[in-house]
Each structure stands twice: as C-alpha cells, then as structure tokens.
Swiss-Prot record:
Key words of the record: Cytoplasm, FAD, Flavoprotein, Methyltransferase, NAD, NADP, Transferase, tRNA processing
A GO cellular component annotation in the UniProt record: cytosol
Family note: Belongs to the MnmG family. TrmFO subfamily.
GO biological process annotation, one example: tRNA wobble uridine modification
Entry EC no(s): 2.1.1.74
Keyword Cytoplasm listed: yes
Protein name: Methylenetetrahydrofolate--tRNA-(uracil-5-)-methyltransferase TrmFO
Enzyme class: transferase
InterPro entries: FAD/NAD-bd_sf (IPR036188), MnmG-rel (IPR002218), MnmG-rel_CS (IPR020595), MnmG_N (IPR040131), TrmFO (IPR004417)
Domain of life: Bacteria
Length: 471
C-alpha cells in the first residue's frame, strides 16, 4: 500500500484515538498521536498508558450471534482492530463476556502504537483548536475532554455540550473475600472467552439483609457535587447504585443484584433474595470488581456499607468507587455522515465525545474515523459501512438518529447509546423455522437476532473487501 507524506493528527490516546491512529497507519498514512497524559492528568486516570480503562474491565458480551455488542466485536476483528486484538491477548475469565487485564491491555496497545513506524506519539496537551496547518484532524479526547479544548470546540459550533455522569465501581482483593459464604458461578453456568462457567464470585443476601443494605445505601453520605455537576443527568447504563436504590426498593434485585440463574452450594435448598456479583479484574485473579456497583458514596461510607454484604465483611478495597462527568456533542446536528464537524470539515470526531456509550462502541467509532481520514488523505471516496452492520447502525445513530424524529415533530434529546439490535434496520424477510413450524416468542426473537448478526457480518466483510475508488 503506497504511503502518504502528510500526517493525520489524532488528539487523544484513549480507546477511540488509539484505534483511529492504528487504522490510519495501517493504510500507509503517517499519524501524529497527541496525548496530554502525563503532562496533564484527569480525576479518573491512574496511569499514562494509552487506552487506559478507567471504569469496568469488561468489553461486555462476546456472543457474535445473539448479542449486538458481540457482533460489533466480530466486525472489529474482521477490520483488524488493535483494541480487539489487545483485548483477546489479555482476556480474563468472565462468563459470556470479554473482560481483560486492564494493565496488560493498556501496555499491549501502547507498545503496538509506539512500535509502528508511521506513528509518532507526542505527550502534550492541546488547549485550543488545532492550528490551520493541520488539515486533517481527529479529535478523540473522550468523555474527560479538558475544559479549555471543550470551550474551543463549542465556540466553533455555537452549541452547548451535553454532559452526563459515569460512575466507577469498587475493586476488592480476592484474598479478603470469605469464600465460605461466597461461591464461584456464572449465571446459568454460561462459559465465555477463556472462561469455565464459574467465573463470577457470588455473595447472597436474604430478604432482611437486602432491605438493610438498601437502607444503608440510601442513608449513606454522598460526595458533594460541584455547581456545574448538579444539573448534569446520569446515563441509565451507568447509574450509581444508590441512585438505583432511591428509584425503588426492589430496583436493585431486578438489576445488578438479580439472583436468577445462580445456586448457592453452601445452602442449595434456599434461594437467595438478591446476589452481589464480582468479576475478575486482572489476569492474576487477585482483584475482583463489584459488578454494577458504581457509586458516589464517600469512600468511608463505601467501605462501611459494602462490608455489610455477606462474604465481604472483611473486604479490602484496591480501589473505591467514584464518579466523573462526561461531555459529548449534539452529534446529529454538528457532525456529517463521516464524523466531520459541519462547521469545520477538517475536524473529525471519534469516541465517547460523539455520544456513543461504551468501550467497544468508542473504539468502533475510532475505527471508522481512522478509515475515513485515511481514505480522505489518499484521495479515495468516503463510503460509510452499510446500515445493516453494527458499525453502520452505530454511525447512523450518532450522525442522524435523532434529527429525523425532531423534524417529524417528536423532539427528544440526543443521548449516549450502546449498540443494540434496535439500531439495526429490520430484516428484509422474517426468519422461518422448520417446515410446518412457526417461530414464536423467545425462539422467534433469537432467530431474528441470529439473522441480523449473520447479515451484519456478511455485509461488513463485503464493505471491507470493496476496492477503493477515487473521490
């Protein structure tokens, strides 16, 4: 593949920026990757590594047939994703999910980018709009975009940014968990990548313990919000556990503490009223994170409240939970169909700042932005992935998913979105069962998902194989 002399500048070394830089460089186009850490850090980052995971260590389901994020995984592998390659190399057992050793994952991404001959990494903060001589730029500054740069971008658009909160779950040392009360089991004994079907630690609560826990959560002292945070809405996919508890006493046991698909081997005849799950957080198996337990409780309150959970009475925390404010653009109004800023098309955006939600989605948007930028630099036509693919469905949501609804007289605010089958266009033909058998209920739903997944992977492969043509 012939090389292009002029670089594309990628600002931000998170999941999206790292993936974008990789996709550009592998297409023979030089890249300058700008990362402000360690010169300037954030409240959520702990290292200066590229693609650091600041929240969960899970990339969610790896099922390429029945789960939309699993389809996105598969498409990214088809496209030579650096993020998925590093995740596969650093996976830890997690039932049906793809979870990673966060430090090993970040090191693998950092090394791959440092070793690529067409990638230059500059450790510096960008506080203003990129200089005019940077004619191709991807801004992948993420949910923790520095205030100065956010203001500079907003001054160009005339719009205000939307913001939401992401909360961070606590991490517990394995050897402090009482396995005489807790046990290993995946829900419904389902194995996943590198897993055994017994990949989660489960802590059971009876009805009285559950209600006492809910009371303690609600009464627990929360960290105060700064003035600018008070009006910021939470994203439903990452609600603090105490906010869920405040929404209803039974909310948690139908959410992250649901007891279904699990049997306590210490007391197999008694069904738990609720169950707390912990997922392996590092390859050594020495750390486990509390699934769905992101929180804004003060640190002292967290230790006190979470130690009321059976099995965690003597828990030692490697990290306590926290909360950080995320910022994202009103992308349907501000970005075109290839993620360029309408007000200044030399600027392209990628990752969570575009309004996608989740590690995998952020990296996928980075993958598309990188391919678009490389094609543009090489004078090739910009062809978005088909709407029938997970990438195409995600892109359509970000760049146009809400504008049509508003124009039709049904306004609603643009919100962060995980990939899901609801973003895919309907099947041209409904799946059929065996001759003489009509699909119904769950069987019909699963057949539709499998058909959508098969269509997505076939169409993604065809898109990737399409020869480039001149713009």
């Amino acid at each position: 593949m012939p090389q292009s002399a002029d670089p594309v500048h990628v600002v931000g070394g998170g999941l999206a920026g790292s993936e974008a830089a990789w996709q550009i460089a592998t297409r023979g186009v030089p890249v300058v990757l700008h990362e402000m850490r360690p010169q300037r850090t954030t409240d959520a980052h702990l290292t200066d590594g590229l693609a650091e995971l600041v929240c969960s260590n899970s990339f969610r389901s790896d099922d390429p047939e029945g789960n939309a994020v699993g389809v996105l995984h598969a498409e990214m592998r088809q496209a030579g994703s650096l993020i998925l390659t590093a995740a596969d190399q650093n996976q830890v057992p997690a039932g049906g999910a793809l979870a990673v050793d966060r430090d090993g994952f970040s090191r693998a991404v950092t090394k791959a980018l440092e070793d690529h001959p067409l990638i230059e990494i500059r450790r510096e903060e960008l506080t203003t709009l990129p200089p005019a001589e940077w004619d191709k730029v991807i801004l992948a500054t993420g949910p923790l975009t520095s205030p100065a740069l956010a203001e500079a971008v907003l001054s160009l658009t005339g719009e205000t940014a939307l913001a939401f909160f992401d909360a961070i779950a606590p991490i517990v040392h394995f050897d402090s968990i009482d396995m005489g009360k807790a046990w290993f089991q995946s829900r419904y004994d389902k194995p996943g990548p590198g897993g055994t079907g017994a990949d989660y630690i489960n802590c059971p609560l009876d009805e009285a313990q559950y209600h006492a826990f809910v009371d303690a959560l609600i009464a627990g002292e929360k960290a105060p919000m700064r003035d600018f945070e008070a009006k910021t809405p939470y994203f439903d996919g990452c609600l603090p556990i105490e906010v869920m508890a405040e929404r209803g006493r039974e909310t948690l046991r139908f959410g992250p503490m649901k007891p279904v698909g699990l049997t306590n081997p210490h007391n197999p005849t008694v069904k738990a009223y609720a169950i707390v799950q912990l997922r392996q957080d590092n390859k050594l198996g020495t750390l486990y994170n509390m699934v769905g337990f992101q929180t804004k409780l003060r640190h002292g309150e967290q230790a006190r409240v979470f130690r009321t959970i059976p099995g965690l009475e003597n828990a030692e925390f490697a990290r306590l939970g926290g909360l950080h404010r995320n910022t994202y653009l009103n992308s349907p109004r501000l970005l075109d169909g290839t993620l360029r800023l309408k007000a200044d098309p030399r600027l392209r955006f990628a990752g969570q700042i575009t309004g996608c939600e989740g590690y995998v989605e952020s990296a996928a948007v980075g993958l598309m932005a990188g391919r678009f930028a490389a094609a543009e630099r090489r004078g090739e036509a910009l062809v978005p992935p088909p709407l029938t693919t997970a990438h195409g469905a995600l892109l359509a949501h970000i760049t146009g998913g809400h504008v049509e609804a508003e124009e039709a007289g049904a306004p609603r605010s643009f919100q962060p979105m995980n990939i899901n089958f609801g973003l895919f266009p309907p099947l041209e033909e409904a799946p059929r069962g065996e001759p003489g058998k009509r699909l119904r209920g769950a069987e019909k739903t699963l057949a539709k998902k499998k058909a959508m997944a098969a269509r997505a992977l076939a169409h993604m492969a065809a898109w990737l194989d399409t020869p480039a043509r001149a713009a």
